[in-house]
Amino acid sequence: KRNIIEVNKINFSVRLLPLICYEIIYTGKIFNNRDFDFIVNISEDGWFGQSIGPHQHFVHSIYRGIESGKYVLRSANNGIAAIVNPLGVVEKKVDLNQSGYVDFIESKKITPTIFSKYGNKIFGLMILLYILLIFSFNRIKNE
């Protein structure tokens, strides 16, 4: 379980879920920690070289934002740095092998997603329903 970093100021409080490098590709890192405001992903994508790796790694961070319904703040040395909103829209971005920064001024909160509440249990329920449907159709077919 990853610890949440809490920053408290006089009129401001924020809880960050830090995910280092490839941890962003694992959904379980997020759903073992549900009480956070933003996902912060720090990565060194230089070891991917000129492959498609940095792009795939970045796309995983977009999915984590959508699943959790939270902003992803991504900083990547030699990779793609970006701010991704909870709907998966890349609001600001510094492209691969470019230097720069992005300002994050305001955030929008959305209601928790079904996936952020129940995680992979949804898929277990879908499998169970599918099995029940198979047995139901077989029963109807045999009558």
Describe the residue ranges of each PLM region.
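Solvent-exposed soluble domains appended to multi-pass membrane proteins
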Residues: 1-143
